[in-house]
């Protein structure tokens, strides 16, 4: 699988130049440029995992190196600092992002040609969380969501996957297609978490299919998982 690692250059120095009354401004600018990056990424059929805001990842199977260069140039035009990128390859998203991260710090070829793989996206949703908000505080609910995020991250890490919190009680994960059965086995009898699985040629399609799967689960309350796959 192919993962693009993106690092904002001199990001800390940029934030320090904003003065002491800066945190509100940093949040404003971060959200503004991430909104633009999401828009650009969608045009190239991928999706940014925001991570720390100054570093993020993209699953880029199904995208040519030429398209990647165009996308990077488009992003650079909308960022307040420079960026450094590198393309990594691995049998799993976790391995690919590791290789991409290491590549950021050396002088090897940044864009080798790699074979595209199908992408498996996972859209996780917590059962009854909205209803539970009536009986707990906003902060306690947030802590529960955070704990679940940690648990899901650890599980996916063990099978070579990566995870992003989407907001609310939703999470987005990526695994290799070879690991899908492990996800199904894990959540087939789970009455707390449902997972929509989408398999596609690129990240945007896989995510769309994962969300489609999740909606089908919601319409059939007896199921905890469903899978949709793109065929060519």
Curated annotation (Swiss-Prot):
Enzyme class: hydrolase
GO MF entries: GTP binding; GTP cyclohydrolase IIa activity
Species the sequence originates in: Saccharolobus islandicus (strain Y.G.57.14 / Yellowstone #1)
Protein name stated in the entry: GTP cyclohydrolase III
Keyword Nucleotide-binding set for record: yes
Entry superkingdom: Archaea
Keyword vocabulary terms for this entry: GTP-binding, Hydrolase, Nucleotide-binding
Catalysis performed (reactions): GTP + 3 H2O = 2-amino-5-formylamino-6-(5-phospho-D-ribosylamino)pyrimidin-4(3H)-one + 2 phosphate + 2 H(+)
InterPro entries, sorted: GTP_CycHdrlase_3, Nucleotide_cyclase, Rev_trsase/Diguanyl_cyclase
Family: Belongs to the archaeal-type GTP cyclohydrolase family.
Recorded name of the encoding gene: gch3
Gene3D superfamilies per UniProt: 3.30.70.270, Nucleotide cyclase
Record lineage: Archaea, Thermoproteota, Thermoprotei, Sulfolobales, Sulfolobaceae
């Amino acid at each position: 699988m192919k993962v693009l690692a993106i690092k904002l250059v001199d990001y800390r120095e940029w934030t320090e130049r904003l003065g002491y009354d800066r945190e509100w401004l940093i949040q404003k600018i971060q959200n503004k440029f991430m909104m633009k990056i999401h828009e650009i990424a969608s045009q190239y059929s991928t999706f940014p995992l925001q991570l720390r805001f100054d570093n993020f990842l993209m699953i880029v199977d199904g995208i040519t190196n030429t398209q990647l260069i165009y996308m990077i140039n488009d992003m650079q035009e909308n960022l307040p600092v420079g960026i450094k990128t590198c393309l990594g390859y691995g049998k799993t998203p976790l391995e690919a992002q590791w290789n991409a991260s290491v590549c950021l710090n050396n002088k090897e070829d940044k864009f080798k040609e790699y074979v595209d793989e199908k992408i498996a996206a996972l859209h996780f949703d917590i059962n009854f969380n909205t209803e539970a908000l009536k009986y707990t505080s906003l902060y306690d609910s947030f802590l529960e969501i955070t704990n679940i995020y940690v648990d899901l991250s650890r599980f996916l890490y063990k099978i070579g996957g990566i995870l992003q919190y989407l907001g609310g009680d939703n999470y987005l994960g990526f695994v290799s297609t070879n690991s899908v059965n492990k996800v199904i086995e894990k959540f087939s009898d789970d009455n707390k978490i449902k997972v929509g699985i989408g398999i596609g040629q690129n990240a945007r399609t896989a995510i769309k299919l994962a969300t489609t799967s999740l909606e089908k689960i919601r319409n059939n309350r007896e199921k905890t998982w469903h899978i949709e796959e793109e065929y060519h």
